[in-house]
Amino acid sequence: MAPPARVEARVPTAATDDWGRQPDSLMSAVPPRTLEAGVGARGSGSASSRLWIADTDFRLHDDIGFFIQRMLIRMEPTRPGAPLSLDDPTAMVARIQAGEIFVSDATLATLLNQDLAASRAAVRNLRMSTRKDGQEVRGELLRKGRWRPLRMLTEIELSGPLEVTLVPRRIFVDGVEVTSSLAAASIEMSEVLKLKTRHMELVGNRIRVDLDGLFPPPRLDFRVSRLALADGGMQLALGDSLADLQWPALRAPDSYMFIEGGDIKMARTVLVKAYALFTSLSPGQPLLFNLYDYRRQLQNGVIRLREDGMVQIAVSPVKAPAPLEARL
């Protein structure tokens, strides 16, 4: 069993934290606040929480997640009056108001492979290699009872607020290029390959990918406003412009999560009208937060409390390796 989290009310100013700075510098990173008289010990009456994120490796679990450069999320419980429980991601909705994220090839491949496997599709074991000028997709194609190597050189387009489209430019089956023969016979890919799953559909020579509900809980309510290919994945702009946001006046490290408002249930504790700053326990490393394994991270982290109810949590990146494709 992991050791319990350490709770420190005030650390002597002579001590230093993992950044080599005095812990009080983190305790004062968030402006002081005054709680309204209507805020009780069991609940604040707030219907939602604002989650501000900067330069954070955010995982839903070990092999699914994305790197968030900047983001504002409004978190709401699905049951009115209930606190947001980190132990039950299905009971919350994350409404992304604005943000910029990087989705790695490994994460996208894992999500699509899970979708293909659930539908027993004739394509499996996708692997992706993305560059700024295009993407290479490798996998296996079921033809005449045999799984055969499949390779495609594709472009990726944003075809809707919740849809991206893979457009194959060159197609190889069993190591043989079939692009020109299909074109010469005026045959579209969908005529020789039937592909329709919950989130993927081959229409003509285009593979549509529906992003709505593709990620595991919590429910993500968002729209993609811009897509750009990058080495190793996709850069997505979500929701409104970040420039229109009034960011909190924090004096925090470059990498953090800041929760403001609402009631948050973590393990057996409820943060009433939450006012919490999450930072990394590892010196010089970005915050890595693993939602499905947050308890283990907190057990190996450090929690500090302030008189006005602000909580500063230094998170340990335990059990959180870099994403790898799930071969199904």
What are these regions (language model features)?
Residues 4-328:
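Extracellular/lumenal and peripheral-membrane lipid-interaction modules
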